């Protein structure tokens, strides 16, 4: 604990590049050390973190979500151009001073990212459709394949894309699904209803 405190001494900005549960854990530790530190979360879903932020009375945080990445995790898979020409969603939930938000957005712009400002609710709803639901479908598709089928022999481009997505860190995505469960339930029901409509055409 003391070592962690020494690492953040005199820091004015900390970017939280971790999973949702680790972000909450780190915020719980960091908030008691220096209330002047500005926190920046990079999580894919904001609901769980925001619920903690509200309950803990943390005001000095901004959510930014870079729309980039890969199914591979870990520093060994790092890429210097990961954020170049990629969109970054900026969500200011605490009405931080304009200059604070601007400074964070400048950091992203300096590495080639494009800034999109959005409300928390819109972020959770839009990203459910464009990211969270597709990952859920990919995981479900892999669970649906007969175990006797040799995937390596009989799969082409379509299934390989499902395989790639399903190789994403399951713990990370379990956190995301849980955090955005309200929207994900709605999206899943829409998907299931459309699937049944297609199945009816087979009759």
Locate each region found by the language model.
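Short phosphate-binding/catalytic loops that engage adenosine nucleotides
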Residues: 2, 35, 112-113
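Short, small-residue-biased leader/transition segments that mark boundaries at the very start
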Residues: 3-8
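N-terminal Rossmann-like NAD(P) cofactor-binding module of classical short-chain dehydrogenase/reductase
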Residues: 14-15, 40
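Glycine-rich, N-terminal phosphate-binding loop of Rossmann-like dinucleotide-binding domains
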Residues: 17-19, 43, 92
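Rossmann-like NAD(P)(H) cofactor-binding subdomain of soluble oxidoreductases
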Residues: 24-76
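Short, flexible, solvent-exposed loop/turn segments with mixed acidic/basic and small polar residues
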Residues: 30, 76-82, 174-175
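Internal alpha-helical scaffold of NAD(P)-dependent oxidoreductase catalytic cores
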Residues: 80-165
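Interdomain hinge/lid region at the active-site interface
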Residues: 150-203
């Amino acid at each position: 604990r003391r070592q962690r405190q020494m690492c953040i001494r005199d820091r004015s900005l900390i970017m939280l590049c971790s999973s949702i549960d680790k972000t909450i854990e780190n915020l719980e530790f960091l908030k008691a050390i220096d209330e002047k530190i500005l926190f920046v979360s990079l999580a894919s879903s904001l609901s769980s973190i925001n619920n903690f932020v509200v309950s803990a009375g943390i005001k000095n945080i901004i959510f930014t979500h870079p729309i980039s990445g890969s199914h591979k995790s870990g520093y060994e898979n790092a890429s210097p151009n990961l954020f170049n020409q990629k969109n970054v969603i900026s969500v200011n939930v605490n009405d931080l001073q304009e200059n604070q938000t601007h400074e964070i957005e400048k950091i992203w712009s300096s590495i080639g990212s494009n800034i999109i400002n959005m409300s928390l609710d819109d972020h959770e709803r839009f990203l459910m459709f464009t990211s969270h639901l597709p990952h859920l479908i990919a995981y479900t598709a892999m669970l649906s394949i007969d175990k006797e089928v040799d995937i390596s022999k009989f799969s082409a481009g379509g299934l390989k894309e499902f395989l790639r997505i399903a190789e994403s860190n399951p713990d990370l995505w379990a956190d995301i699904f849980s955090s955005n469960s309200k929207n994900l339930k709605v999206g899943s029901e829409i998907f299931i209803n459309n699937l049944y409509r297609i199945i009816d055409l087979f009759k």
